[in-house]
Amino acid sequence: MARGKAKEEGSWKKFIWNSEKKEFLGRTGGSWFKILLFYVIFYGCLAGIFIGTIQVMLLTISELKPTYQDRVAPPGLTQIPQIQKTEISFRPNDPKSYEAYVLNIVRFLEKYKDSAQRDDMIFEDCGDVPSEPKERGEFNHERGERKVCRFKLEWLGNCSGLNDETYGYKEGKPCIIIKLNRVLGFKPKPPKNESLETYPGMKYNANVLPVQCTGKRDEDKEKIGNVEYFGLGNSPGFPLQYYPYYGKLLQPKYLQPLLAVQFTNLTMDTEIRIECKAYGENIGYSEKDRFQGRFDVKIEVKS
């Protein structure tokens, strides 16, 4: 039995290194060289094909504009303050209860201050009333960076923070700021006049993408009270001269147009579900994405 074990051990050692044939793991040095050379060439070719494929693909992609622009989803609609669970709950007589909401709005509006828009090489005035989309040439580097339209805080009225640093929360009249998310090259198409007839209070403007905030349910509509809108030209929506957006490379300082909404007499001590919705021919809605073209927010003003 000992001899069999010794013989087995000898065979194992001989397989690793055969001194008679000068073989390591059953192969000579020349054999190992050939097989290693084969795999180096083989994987080198695979790497070359992969790199070449990537390079060809990159030649078809523009860093300035999506290749398949028609497949980009419509922009989402979001509100500030940006909150967890889309709930705003506070007591007007308790500053701590609404402090986080106010700070969120203040931080967001920093870039909209006049002091941040003084450079005439970057910013330009695009008018105090809504107008048609402002084309700024092709999506290329030939003209360098493009100018962007200024947006004045004073257009946000009671929700500008210029006269009320609490944005209405101290008075129990909360403000929210609404923006349409950036989509490169997107030009909003306002709805046709006749399509707005079914929405009370909405007025047609060919140069405004309208937005309306209403109670989500029938019981909410009775408790939402008066809703006031503040935007450029006192229009309840987004003026078209701020579109299209040319991207971070061509418009690094771009400012989205804003719409401020103030709820002036919400029913107290009641959670009210509010839906804000943008209307347009190229604005879509999705059950899978609750921010695509609209959003819901719950507001409760406690006594």
Swiss-Prot record:
The keyword Disulfide bond applies. It is found in: Cell membrane; Apical cell membrane; Cell membrane, Sarcolemma. Residues 63-303 are extracellular. PROSITE patterns: ATPASE_NA_K_BETA_1, ATPASE_NA_K_BETA_2. Glutathionylated. N-glycosylated. The modification Phosphoserine is found at S11. Keywords: Cell adhesion, Cell membrane, Disulfide bond, Glutathionylation, Glycoprotein, Immunity, Innate immunity, Ion transport, Membrane, Phosphoprotein, Potassium, Potassium transport, Signal-anchor, Sodium, Sodium transport, Sodium/potassium transport, Transmembrane, Transmembrane helix, Transport. GO terms for molecular function: ATPase activator activity. It is a single-pass type II membrane protein. Its main location: membrane. Gene3D superfamilies: 1.20.5.170, Na, k-atpase alpha subunit. The C-terminal lobe folds into an immunoglobulin-like domain and mediates cell adhesion properties. This is Sodium/potassium-transporting ATPase subunit beta-1.
